[in-house]
């Protein structure tokens, strides 16, 4: 799929009509002015409707541009503008999925702008900056945008976001992550700056094992774990090991090298020399296809419970050599949200927006991009309600606020110091646009249910 900026001019009337059909539309309302509530600490967000809104870096009284990088914004030229930053991977290991993530995020704010915006403001994402999935380049990209934005629409990667957290702290810069590290749910780690969404890798790992044991016609006694150390692999592995201990399952091997040191041959070698009933990969899509294919060539087809970043709907596209393997009933994928076709108001709005933009993809990475913005939207709305759209005000709003997503995810209280534990589990299926048939939604197995989520992150 091409980046949104290369899609050309979008027909605004079509988008407006489709959004109206989904219930969108701007309505006028009268708000009684009240005195703003005084906020003393970062843990006490403003919750009153203020007479005026204090603004700072990245917020202007001037309207948003009509387009950014050739992409229409649907901004209201009678309103001010909230600018968001984007730290994406255009040239690194996730370059192939970066366009879908960006497309969905820009589409999300187009929808928000076309249905009333955030108070007296429209919202736009500035041109994305390439991080190459490298922490140092991530910092350089952050520095390139830090004086121009009120918050980050995306900071892709767990180690990368951790690497810039000190700078975000100095700037009171709140951001939506494109990762599901359990630490994002705890102020001891994220300092109240990362607006998390969806279940953590750790919970998905627990639920993956428990669901497989309860639902599949395989007696799972031994398992293997592979992933990227220091990235999502560690969080995922710790969840699986906790569930394995609870269930009396033997972890025969773990292969968790740093991201750039992952060796497909070594991973396949472990599967050959130490066969297991099931393995749990938390790698990138490229490594996933190579590992699964390599094991298959050796006559091995154990159950595979893939972490969300491991799966790509391209695995079940017509013409892909491993399509039969991924659809064989031995491969399953985890997610923090239901796939593209799900029946929720949020999914319907997303589909309508993507279709109006001329997109025919149902990629899970579109869902990832879209879902990542809901909680940030809730934070900005709370900041406006509190009368403070400075970065400090946005940070206060993120410290303790209920956020919802029109049914895409469960309502969540940010700042609760407790990670979400509900997972979605699917089966690769090329007959469906998203490439996934949903088998279980908001699933919580016995391990995740018994785990002390108030005790801090899993890794």
Describe these PLM feature segments.
Residues 23-26:
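Bacterial signal peptide processing site
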Residues 18-21:
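C-terminal motif of bacterial Sec signal peptides marking the signal peptidase cleavage site
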Residues 295-370, 455-458:
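Extracellular/periplasmic periplasmic-binding protein-like sensory domains
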Residues 69-70, 149-255, 303-328:
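Extracytoplasmic ligand/sensor domains, especially the bilobed periplasmic-binding protein
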Residues 69, 96-103, 115-188, 197, ...:
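Beta-alpha junction/loop-to-helix N-cap segments that form part of ligand/metal-binding clefts
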Residues 229, 237-241, 285, 290, ...:
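Extracellular/periplasmic ligand-binding modules, especially the Venus flytrap/periplasmic-binding
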Residues 42-75, 80-82, 401-459:
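Solvent-exposed, acidic/polar segments of extracytosolic/periplasmic ligand-binding ectodomains
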Residues 60, 67-79, 85-106, 128-135, ...:
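Extracytoplasmic "Venus flytrap"
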